[in-house]
Amino acid sequence: MQIKDISHLYNIIKTFLLYGIDEALPQHRYTRAIRCWRKTLFWLRNQHKDKTFGLRLRLALQELGPVWIKLGQMLSTRRDLFPPDIADELALLQDQVDPFDGKIARAQIEKALGAPLETWFDEFNETALASASIAQVHTAKFKQNAPHLENRLAGKEVVLKVLRPNIQQMINADLSLMYKVASWIPRIKAEGRRLRPVEVVREYEKNLRDELDLRREMANAIQLRANFENSPMLYIPEMYKQFCHQTVIVMERIYGIPVSNIEELHANGTNMKLLAERGVQVFFTQVFRDSFFHADMHPGNIFVNRAHPDDPQYIGIDCGIVGRLNDHDKRYLAESFVAFFNRDYRRVAEMHVASGWTPKDTNIDDFEQAFREVCEPIFAKPLSEISFGHVLLNLFNVAREYNMEVQPQLVLLQKTLLYIEGLGRQLYPQLDLWDTAKPFLQKWLDEQMGIKAFTKSVKQKLPYWREHLVDLPENVMDALAQQKIIADELIHLNRTLAKKRNIPHFTSFILGLCTGLAIWLLIYLLS
């Protein structure tokens, strides 16, 4: 280990000790050594005893910087690993850091594009428009006579997003340490194996390295834009593919009212009721129609088009984090909500076990009662005031007590849903979430489980059956003929063995074995 690595490790341990994170460690010979270091090597005491553990953990990760902030954000989606209060605190981590030098950004962009910025752009602003842990953005304009540029783009305002320099080395150093810590956890904590810490770090590394290739964000934006092409509900800025690379992407610059600026939205004459309802509609359209949703829809990434305020349209930016759902996920989501609002907790419990996410030996009666105790108080509110996000959160928390491994994509969806609901009620406090969302849930369930869905499934399988039904009579006759031969042989064998009365148990065994083989062979021939 080099001197700089030792120094880096020292700073990380020191930060965790300052916030008393070591207090969460169980009594063990390894952890006793850590507590001894606090007094001898570091001369530190917990300076934040008045704060909750979740808050202390969040502050420590925030102080450690970008890589640790992103780790905390990822861990907040793993509610099978942490109690709700800690997961909620981690979800508050903000991915905001000081910008790096604009001249360095210019050099990075020119290296990626392979030519000076002046080749294609005018008015490049070296002062960053915004800055985060992985990248920052700058503004510019396309030149009027830039080479190989479509005429429609001449003079158009753009945003350039560029990765931070040396981010790869920073990530490698921190990941190496995270893997070491993860490998220790099963040794010092009885529950460590269930938590699978090395797998958690591996999942985090994959997500983080995905973010280091900005072409993924470009691809996400292109797909979302295509999904909502010509939609009055949502607009996604255009990506300019010829200028997009691993470390730089270039996109259309948009101007809109920040969705959090309620005063300006009112001043612009925005239909707030319709705007709030469209937020919910956009979300459920992404989930149930497209199986692909923008998963970072906090207020900083959402704007409202200034044009036609009576028919308001959202503008979404920063598509770096998206969620994908399969039919199994969508069925869980739709059936969970429908069963919950019907107060059918038995169905909720059975569904969790049937999905395979909760152990098969789970006691359904106890599981049902646990859901009832947690969810029933929610109905003290009017139906219109119930939060879908909190319903999901309650379901996850109960399931966690029964060893359910909560799927990350569903927790990502739950967090996004909370954003959307909070935003909707901020825009229009009387928003009825259930009334707005119910048509999407019902339509999807009808499409998947109704008569039309059955007819569609039959049509899809007809070519297979048409091909194989032709041979079915011949296969059946062959199988019956083979069965007759086998039956005759069994009768003969039975008579022979019956004569050997000194080995009755062996006889029974052979007869059973042969009968079993005959049945297996018949099934095999028929298939």
Swiss-Prot record:
Q: Which residues cross the membrane?
A: 506-526
Record's GO cellular component terms: plasma membrane
What is this protein for, i.e. what is its function? Answer: Is probably a protein kinase regulator of UbiI activity which is involved in aerobic coenzyme Q (ubiquinone) biosynthesis.
Bilayer topology: Single-pass membrane protein
The GO terms describing molecular function are:
ATP binding; protein kinase activity
- Pathway the protein takes part in: Cofactor biosynthesis; ubiquinone biosynthesis [regulation]
Alphabetical UniProt keywords: ATP-binding, Cell inner membrane, Cell membrane, Kinase, Membrane, Nucleotide-binding, Transferase, Transmembrane, Transmembrane helix, Ubiquinone biosynthesis
Active-site positions on this chain: 296 (proton acceptor)
Q: Which organism is it from?
A: Pasteurella multocida (strain Pm70)
Protein's recorded name: Probable protein kinase UbiB
The UniProt similarity line reads: Belongs to the ABC1 family. UbiB subfamily.
Which GO BP annotation is one of this protein's?
A: regulation of ubiquinone biosynthetic process
Subcellular location(s): the record lists: Cell inner membrane
Where would I find the Protein kinase domain in this sequence? 123-527
Keyword ATP-binding listed: yes
Q: Where does ATP bind?
A: 129-137, 161
Q: Which InterPro entries does this UniProt record tie to the protein?
A: ABC1_dom, Kinase-like_dom_sf, UbiB, UbiB_bact, UbiB_kinase
The UniProt record lists the EC number as 2.7.-.-
